[in-house]
Regions:
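Bacterial Sec-dependent N-terminal signal peptides
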Residues: 1-6, 11-42
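A broad, structure-centric signal for solvent-exposed, well-ordered loop/edge residues
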Residues: 7-8, 53, 61, 118, ...
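Mature extracytoplasmic/luminal segments of secretory-pathway proteins
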Residues: 16, 48-51, 227
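Feature marks short, surface-exposed loop/turn motifs that line or immediately flank catalytic pockets
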Residues: 19-23, 50, 174
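Secreted/luminal cysteine- and crosslink-motif detector
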Residues: 20, 52-55, 90
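Short amphipathic alpha-helical surface micro-motifs
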Residues: 26, 56-60, 148-151
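Local sequence-structure signature of Cys/Sec-based thiol-disulfide redox active-site neighborhoods
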Residues: 32-78
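Short, conserved sequence motifs used for protein processing/export or organelle targeting and
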Residues: 71-274
Length: 274
């Protein structure tokens, strides 16, 4: 009986060891920068502190689209009318709107590549989200002093050709635009506690809202991965606690006379809108 017990416990011990080894073999490491095959939409707004509609219905519409599409949308706001609006990043804003076919007034809303009225915003977002993604990216952004250092990977999901660009934007939230705001920040027709959000402050490429080519190649294969690293220089006057980074992949329009010279492909960030 004792020999039988010893045999049983010995077998049990080997079984446990064998199970543990099996678990070790199954352990894998996931790349934190591996892009997901997920399509997101893009909303770009042109706005200003000097615009009453921007501070009322424009503000409400922008926030509603963010909230209703949280986790599905890249949302940025370019301010204009410098020097009356102190948040006008003139060169970036000008490069953005000069390659878009927009209207004559503000606010202006662009979903993907199209300038749209409010009633068309959600249907256009829904349409983009149904696309089969060409490519996607993922990144980390870590601040060191006045530099935001970015490490990213771009992944293609189709065999495709073209000139692809990438933009990283440093945006700021919770900028006081209410009754106690300073010159150039107080929002016309805004509430006493008004906050400017998603304000584009800078990008990794000076004076170009569409960034730069992340590869010299013009043909890409399914599952091809490309690494891209860069930095954005921040202004010490900004509140670094409220800065976040968002990114967009663009494709250069081969038709040089087209009103939209950079076509939205996809984008990524970690923002959650409530």
């Amino acid at each position: 009986m004792k020999k039988l017990n010893l045999f049983f416990y010995g077998f049990l011990f080997l079984f446990v060891i064998s199970c543990n080894k099996s678990e070790d073999v199954q352990t894998t490491t996931t790349d934190p920068l591996m892009p997901e095959m997920k399509q997101r939409a893009f909303m770009g707004e042109l706005t200003s502190t000097t615009c009453g509609i921007c501070g009322s219905s424009g503000y409400n519409n922008f926030n509603l689209m963010k909230k209703n599409n949280s986790g599905k949308i890249i949302a940025i706001a370019f301010h204009c009318n410098f020097p009356d609006d102190s948040m006008d990043c003139f060169s970036l804003r000008y490069s953005y709107e000069s390659s878009r076919d927009g209207g004559s007034g503000i606010p202006q809303f662009f979903i993907g590549d199209n300038y749209l009225s409010y009633n068309s915003l959600q249907p256009s977002i829904d349409s983009i989200l149904k696309r089969s993604p060409e490519a996607q990216l993922k990144f980390t952004a870590k601040r060191s002093g006045n530099d935001m250092n970015i490490t990213s990977k771009i992944k293609f999901f189709k065999n495709i050709s073209g000139e692809y660009y990438i933009s990283f934007y440093a945006c700021e939230n919770n900028i006081n635009g209410g009754s106690t705001a300073g010159t150039g920040y107080k929002q016309s027709s805004g509430a006493s506690d008004y906050k400017h959000n998603n304000v584009v402050r800078a990008s990794q490429v000076l004076n170009n809202a569409y960034g730069e080519k992340f590869s010299t190649a013009t043909t890409f294969k399914v599952n091809q991965l490309i690494s891209y690293n860069c930095k954005i220089t921040l202004n010490p006057k900004w509140n670094y606690n409220n800065i976040f980074v968002t990114a967009v992949i663009w494709k250069k329009n081969p038709v040089t006379t087209a009103p939209c010279q950079y076509v939205f492909v996809n984008g990524w960030d970690t923002q959650v809108y409530k």
